[in-house]
């Protein structure tokens, strides 16, 4: 067990020290300048980021209960598999999945932009080529509720709602699509869980999305 933890720890460090694009370096410099400013004002910095590797492991684990619950409820409500996405060409299904991965990040951005100071101008997108992972980041501080709202909206809109709709209308394909998209939000779930578990007696807390890693950083005083 100790060796496994060490291996995961090494992967975490490798992830944090990955090669950044020019845009990521610019965002990181801007973030560190903001961090230094807040620390200079008496704030304490607390990292609430999650590892992409651990998020991928959690996604594998999460897929099992999602499949059991989704398929179980589907056949409790329906006695057979019917149309909709259930009859879609497998290639088109994969194309739709890739398109929804992009939409997933756009939903993060649109949701956070509602609360960001300069709205859409404060939202940027990137791609971790080492992990084939697209991401969205908000460059300005957000309140806790706003941060969580933006983090969970893709899960709700692309995962939970299609799952429920698939069960209700008897479309196994739509159910499967919802399950996959809900599972793709595993990292978002980890981030929100980490935020909700964090306890602080600080009078003021600022939530800022990390510009190059999954998750956020809080500043408290």
What feature does the model see in each segment?
Residues 2-78, 125-221:
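Metalloprotease/metallohydrolase-associated module, dominated by Zn2+-dependent proteases
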Residues 80-82:
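Membrane interface segments of multi-pass transport proteins and intramembrane proteases
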Residues 84-101, 147:
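Short pre-active-site segment immediately N-terminal to the catalytic Zn-binding motif
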Residues 93-106, 120-122, 138-139:
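Charged, low-complexity, helix/coiled-coil-prone segments
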Residues 100-113, 154:
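Active-site recognition of the HExxH zinc-binding catalytic motif
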Residues 108-121, 198:
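Catalytic Zn2+-binding segment of zinc metalloproteases
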């Amino acid at each position: 067990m100790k060796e496994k933890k060490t291996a995961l720890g090494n992967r975490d460090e490798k992830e944090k020290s990955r090669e950044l694009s020019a845009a990521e370096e610019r965002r990181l410099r801007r973030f560190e300048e903001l961090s230094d400013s807040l620390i200079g004002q008496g704030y304490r910095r607390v990292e609430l980021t999650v590892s992409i590797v651990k998020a991928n492991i959690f996604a594998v684990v999460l897929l099992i209960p999602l499949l059991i619950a989704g398929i179980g409820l589907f056949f409790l409500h329906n006695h057979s598999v019917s149309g909709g996405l259930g009859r879609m060409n497998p290639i088109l299904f994969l194309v739709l999945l890739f398109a929804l991965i992009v939409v997933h990040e756009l939903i993060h951005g649109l949701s956070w932009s509602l609360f960001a100071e300069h709205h859409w101008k404060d939202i940027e997108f990137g791609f971790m080529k080492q992990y084939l992972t697209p991401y969205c980041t908000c460059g300005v501080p957000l309140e806790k509720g706003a941060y969580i709202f933006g983090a969970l909206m893709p899960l709700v809109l692309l995962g939970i709602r299609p799952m429920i709709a698939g069960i209700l209308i008897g479309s196994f394909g739509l159910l499967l699509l919802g399950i996959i998209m809900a599972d793709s939000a595993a990292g978002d779930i980890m981030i929100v869980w980490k935020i909700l578990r964090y306890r602080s007696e600080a009078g003021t807390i600022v939530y800022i999305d990390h510009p190059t890693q999954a998750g956020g950083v809080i500043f408290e005083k």
